[in-house]
A protein has these predicted regions:
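Short secondary-structure boundary/capping segments
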Residues: 1, 9-10, 18-19, 69, ...
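N-terminal strand-loop-strand
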Residues: 1-27, 56, 60, 85
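Active-site-adjacent beta-strand/loop module that shapes the phosphate/pyrophosphate-binding cleft
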Residues: 5, 67-92, 104, 126-127, ...
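Generic short beta-strand segments
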Residues: 62-66
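Charged phosphate-binding loop/patch that engages nucleotide di/tri-phosphates or the phosphate backbone
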Residues: 121-141
Length: 141
C-alpha cells in the first residue's frame, strides 16, 4: 500500500503560529504534496509562499506520522518542518490562497482550542520549544 506524502511547515511570527482553515473546517499547517524532483525543504518553502505569500527558510524536520482523513477515508504521510520567515516578511500580513477559507495567527494557548489534528499540535509545540531555546536552525540528529 502506498500513501501520498504531505510536507507541512510550522511558521512563527511574534510568538504566533500561522494556520490555514481548510474545506473540512479544520485548521492546518501550510504545505502540500511532495512532487517528483522536489526536495521536502523546497516543497515547504514554495507551498508556504503559494498559500500565504510569505517567503520562508526551511529548518529541521519536527515530526512525521500517518494521518487518517476520516471524511474521505484515506491516509496521508505527513512530515512537518520548522520554517523561519525571511527578512522583511514579518511585516507582511499572510494572505489565504483560494485553497483555504481563512488564514490566522494564533498563540500557543489558542491552538489548544482549535479543531486541529494532534500531529500538528505536536509539531507546533516542538517548534515553539526549539525557537524559545534558540535551536530553531539546528539540524535534527
Amino acid at each position: 500500500m502506498t500513501f501520498p506524502v504531505s510536507i507541512k511547515g510550522v511558521v512563527l511570527r511574534a510568538d504566533r503560529v500561522l494556520l490555514l482553515r481548510n474545506d473540512r473546517d479544520e485548521w492546518e499547517l501550510p504545505g502540500g504534496r511532495l512532487e517528483v524532483g522536489e526536495t521536502p525543504e523546497q516543497c515547504v518553502a514554495h507551498e508556504i509562499a503559494e498559500e500565504t505569500g510569505w517567503r520562508v527558510t526551511t529548518g529541521p524536520i519536527l515530526d512525521c506520522w500517518l494521518y487518517h482523513v476520516a471524511q474521505v477515508d484515506r491516509h496521508v504521510v505527513v512530515v512537518t518542518y520548522g520554517a523561519t520567515l525571511e527578512q522583511g516578511q514579518d511585516e507582511l500580513a499572510p494572505v489565504a490562497s483560494a485553497e483555504h477559507a481563512q488564514v490566522g495567527l494564533f498563540t500557543h494557548a489558542e491552538v489548544e482550542d482549535l479543531p486541529l489534528p494532534a500531529g500538528y499540535r505536536r509539531s507546533i509545540a516542538a517548534w515553539y520549544a526549539r525557537s524559545s531555546a534558540g535551536t530553531s536552525s539546528q539540524p535534527t540528529e
